[in-house]
Each structure stands twice: as structure tokens, then as C-alpha cells.
């Protein structure tokens, strides 16, 4: 008789952020996790809420030890979905949750295994009642510890993982729960600490490699090495690792160019890791991992094209300044473009010396605005002629604008406008209804609303001015002629 499926409810289903991320997925995903031959897009903000190990952005991979189907179940649990498992899938999921630091899923698996131990399969009841059996718990014969078992105590020595299972029956009268006694909880805590302190990449007791995660976050693009372990590492073919994170606009089909991540839209900073799109791309590493996917040259502008432009403007001697990127040989351009060894392309004329280090130069200052008009008295320069004429009145003392409401006189129109505000009036006032207007155009539009028969004889638009101007007509020769030289 087959066992019923096990249902693990997720405690994250009520989180509004997780609900939003689950609806948007795979949109706005800033993490791409490779498990075996499958890729799983995810949001680093959601993963960081359940595990520090998973809360990293970028392209990274899991080694042997976790199957794609098991990781898909773990990811569904993290995104707030209830997971239904077959009896044989519970233990691999619990081991994956323990290895990746998803404590809530590991505890849910412990509770599910404890409930199953309380309700054994009726088909195995006959085996439980046989007196010659040393144990009355069928789960112990199946290799699946029940609720009466203590948690696993894992100790790693010399690259080997030894599992010691200590079982005992709790005192009668206490409810049967996972880790019922305080001693069992302490042992479980110690075993977790040992697992966290154990180096990554060692072999387990069954000879298989544990979960191995390679991350690439160094901005320089140089290859980052794992810890040096006494035991051998898995073969290179068993890992789908990326040396550098791929940019979202080049490799992720569910992301569009310039689309921000989920955490940036929600205005919440990430908890762990650094933005993977800030890392410097390394074309050589991409070609090594994804041989059939060629990255356009335009994506390498922060490394290749920028280096060429900076090298063209950082020559140590005046005679060796190249004319542009075309002066570099094809081999030098390729080396500067890839940048896998960190060496820079040499400047033209210095092939036998080390490459010139590219240094950012400040942008050139914009050209000064031409000021052809100069005052004949003080030499102050102006770009417009009327500015020079207004300034010249400072030397002559001329104040051609006079207020119609008081004896105040001003040197220019803007000063007269400010003065009229002290009277609470606009520069223009209708002579029929007394309405004020801030500009001559608005006064002309206002006067069109009056009938021409209402206007007094000899009326002109100047009748609405609250100021008068006594500026003389412009002479043929201005007292402040523009200088012949603009220097």
C-alpha cells in the first residue's frame, strides 16, 4: 500500500513582499542559480530573507548533491507555496535545506517526519507487532529516523563525514516532538555549528561531494579561488559555474535592458552580496563557460573600449600620442578588450615597455561664452548689446524710466517693475476698468475684450503704461562700441 503524499505548508505565504515577488517571477529577477542542467531565476531579496547563503545576486551554481527537482521544491517553499512530497523526497529535501541554510524548511521536514512516525503505515503494522524484532519502530528499519530519534550529530574529520544517530524513548507523559529533550536540542545546535564551520567541498560518508557553491563577485574579474582543502575538489565538468556574473541584459531572457531589480523598486537595500551588474565583465571567462554564446563588443565598454580611449589620451611623451583606437593592432585590441590577465594594451610607439595605466581625466571645460561688447569706461564685457547699454548708465547716471505714481526713477525696466510692486500695481493698467496686467501682451489681449467705441479719442496702448521712458533714440555710433578683439 502506497504512502500518502506529505504536505509542507510554507510560513512565507502571508508575506506581502514574497507574494509580490512570486507573482512577478521571473520578472525583475537578479539571481540565476544553475542546478545540474537547469537554471532557476530568483530574487535575491526573497532568498536573503530565508538564508544567508542564498542571499547573493548574480550567476552562480550548485554542485553535486542537490537535484534540480529538489531545488525546485525548495524554491517553491521559499516563495510561499505549499510543497507536496512523496515519502522518498522528504529526506533529500531536508538535506538540501540543511546544506543551504533554510532553517524553516529543515524544521518543517523534521515535523513532517515526526508526524509520520506517529502514524505508521497500516501495511507495516504486522512487522511492528512481531516480538522477535528488536525495534518496534518501522521507520528505523527504513533508515528514516522518526520522532523518537535524536537529530543527527555530524562530525567531519579529515575530510570525512560521520553520522551518529542516537535514539531513545522520551519519558512517558511528555508529548512526542522532534528534539523533545533539552539535550537533543543542544546536540542539534552543536551539529549545526559543526556543519557551518566545516569547509565547503569535502566528501561525505557515501563518497559523494557535498553541495558546492562558486560565486564570482570580485570586481577585477580575476579568478576567485575556493578554500584550500586537504581533499580533492569535484571535477571541473561536474560544476556549471560562472567565473563572472552575466549581465542581465545579455544573458537573462526575462530581463529587459535597464530594468531595475525587485529590491530597488521596493526601495529596500539588499542584505547580502553586492550588485552583480556592477562587476566588470570578463569576455574570456564567458567564452570559456558559454562557448556558443558570444557577447557583443558594446557590452565590454567599461573594460575594453574605455581602456583604448584612455590609452589614447595618456601617452607619456608628446611624440607617441596615437591618433585613436584605430592605431592599436588587432592583437592589442583583443588583449585590451578581454583583459583576462590584467595587462593593458601598450601605447603606440612603446611596444617594448609596459602599458600605460589608464587614468580618468576630468571632462574638458566648456568654452567660455563669447562677450564681444566691452564698456569703454571700465572695460567690463557683455555678450549682448543692450546689457552693455544698461551698464553704461551706471557711469552716466541716466535713469530713463520714471514711475507714473511717484517721482521714482530707475535705470532699467526690470528695476521699474520691481518698484511698481511696492505700489501694489502691475506695470500695465487698463484705462477703462483699471485691471492690471503683468506684461504688454496680456494687456493687449485684455483690451481686445473692450469695445472700440469705449476707448477715448487718441487712445494708444501706451496709455496703459504706469511708467514712462525718456530714452533717446539710438545714436548711429554707440558710446560703447564692441571691441574688435574678443581676447
UniProtKB/Swiss-Prot annotation:
One GO term of the biological process aspect: regulation of immune system process
Tissue: Predominantly expressed in testis. Some isoforms are ubiquitously expressed.
Compositionally skewed regions (Pro residues) per UniProt: 357-369
Keywords carried by this UniProt record: DNA-binding, Metal-binding, Nucleus, Repeat, Repressor, Transcription, Transcription regulation, Zinc, Zinc-finger
Biased composition (Basic and acidic residues): 112-166
BTB domain segment(s): 29-87
GO MF terms held by the record: DNA binding; DNA-binding transcription factor activity, RNA polymerase II-specific; DNA-binding transcription repressor activity, RNA polymerase II-specific; RNA polymerase II cis-regulatory region sequence-specific DNA binding; sequence-specific double-stranded DNA binding; zinc ion binding
Transmembrane segments: none
Principal cellular location given in the protein's record: nucleus
Composition-biased stretches (Polar residues): 308-320
Zinc finger boundaries on the chain: C2H2-type: 373-395, 401-423, 428-450
Database matches in InterPro entries: BTB/POZ_dom, SKP1/BTB/POZ_sf, Znf_C2H2_sf, Znf_C2H2_type
GO annotation, cellular component aspect: chromatin; nucleoplasm; nucleus
PROSITE patterns the UniProt entry points to: BTB, ZINC_FINGER_C2H2_1, ZINC_FINGER_C2H2_2
Protein's job: DNA-binding protein that binds to the to a 5'-TGTACAGTGT-3' core sequence. May function as a transcriptional transactivator and transcriptional repressor. Probably exerts its repressor effect by preventing GATA3 from binding to DNA. May play a role in regulating the differentiation and activation of helper T-cells.
Free-text comment about domains: The C-terminal zinc finger domain functions as a transcriptional transactivator. The BTB (POZ) domain possesses repressor activity.
Family named by the database record: Belongs to the krueppel C2H2-type zinc-finger protein family.
Subunit details: Homodimer (via PTB domain). Interacts with the N-terminal of FANCC. Interacts with ZBTB16. Interacts with GATA3.
Record's protein name: Zinc finger and BTB domain-containing protein 32
Organism: Homo sapiens (Human)
Amino acid at each position: 500500500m502506497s504512502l500518502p503524499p506529505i504536505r509542507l505548508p510554507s510560513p512565507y505565504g502571508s508575506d506581502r513582499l514574497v507574494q509580490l515577488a512570486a507573482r512577478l517571477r521571473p520578472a525583475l529577477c537578479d539571481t540565476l542559480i544553475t542546478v545540474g542542467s537547469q537554471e532557476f531565476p530568483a530574487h535575491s531579496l526573497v532568498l536573503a530573507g530565508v538564508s544567508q547563503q542564498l542571499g547573493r545576486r548574480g550567476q552562480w551554481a550548485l554542485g553535486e548533491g542537490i537535484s534540480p527537482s529538489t531545488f525546485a521544491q525548495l524554491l517553491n517553499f521559499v516563495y510561499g507555496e505549499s510543497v507536496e512530497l512523496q515519502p522518498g523526497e522528504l529526506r533529500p529535501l531536508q538535506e538540501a535545506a540543511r546544506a543551504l541554510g533554510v532553517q524553516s524548511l529543515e524544521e518543517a521536514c523534521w515535523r513532517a517526519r515526526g508526524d509520520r512516525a506517529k502514524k505508521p503505515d497500516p501495511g507495516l503494522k504486522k512487522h511492528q507487532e512481531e516480538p522477535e524484532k528488536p525495534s518496534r519502530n518501522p521507520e528505523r528499519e527504513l533508515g528514516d529516523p522518526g520522532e523518537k530519534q535524536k537529530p543527527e550529530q555530524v562530525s567531519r574529520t579529515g575530510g570525512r563525514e560521520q553520522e551518529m544517530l542516537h535514539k531513545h524513548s522520551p519519558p512517558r507523559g511528555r508529548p512526542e516532538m522532534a528534539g523533545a529533550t533539552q539535550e537533543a536540542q543542544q546536540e542539534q545546535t552543536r551539529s549545526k555549528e559543526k556543519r557551518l564551520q566545516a569547509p565547503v567541498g569535502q566528501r561525505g560518508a557515501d563518497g559523494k561531494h557535498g553541495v558546492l557553491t562558486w560565486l564570482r563577485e570580485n570586481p577585477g574579474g580575476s579568478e576567485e579561488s575556493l578554500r584550500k582543502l586537504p581533499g580533492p575538489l569535484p571535477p571541473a565538468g561536474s560544476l556549471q559555474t560562472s567565473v563572472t556574473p552575466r549581465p542581465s541584459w545579455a544573458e537573462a531572457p526575462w530581463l529587459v535592458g535597464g530594468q531595475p531589480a525587485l529590491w530597488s523598486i521596493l526601495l529596500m537595500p539588499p542584505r547580502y552580496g553586492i550588485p552583480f551588474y556592477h562587476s566588470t565583465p570578463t569576455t574570456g571567462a564567458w567564452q570559456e563557460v558559454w562557448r556558443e554564446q558570444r557577447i557583443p563588443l558594446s557590452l565590454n565598454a567599461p573594460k575594453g573600449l574605455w581602456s583604448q580611449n584612455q590609452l589614447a589620451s595618456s601617452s607619456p611623451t608628446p611624440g607617441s600620442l596615437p591618433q585613436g583606437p584605430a592605431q592599436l593592432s588587432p592583437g592589442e585590441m583583443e588583449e585590451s578588450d578581454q583583459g583576462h590577465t590584467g595587462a593593458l594594451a601598450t601605447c603606440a610607439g612603446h611596444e617594448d615597455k609596459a602599458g600605460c595605466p589608464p587614468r580618468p581625466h576630468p571632462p574638458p571645460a566648456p568654452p567660455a561664452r563669447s562677450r564681444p561688447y566691452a564698456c569703454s569706461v571700465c572695460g567690463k564685457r557683455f555678450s549682448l548689446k543692450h546689457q552693455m547699454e544698461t551698464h553704461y548708465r551706471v557711469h552716466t547716471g541716466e535713469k530713463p524710466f520714471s514711475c507714473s505714481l511717484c517721482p521714482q526713477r530707475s535705470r532699467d525696466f526690470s528695476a521699474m517693475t520691481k518698484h511698481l510692486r511696492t505700489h501694489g500695481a502691475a506695470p500695465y493698467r487698463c484705462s477703462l476698468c483699471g485691471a492690471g496686467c503683468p506684461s504688454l501682451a496680456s494687456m493687449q489681449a485684455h483690451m481686445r475684450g473692450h469695445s472700440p467705441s469705449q476707448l477715448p479719442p487718441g487712445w494708444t496702448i501706451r496709455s496703459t503704461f504706469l511708467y514712462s521712458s525718456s530714452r533717446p533714440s539710438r545714436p548711429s555710433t554707440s558710446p560703447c562700441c564692441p571691441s574688435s578683439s574678443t581676447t
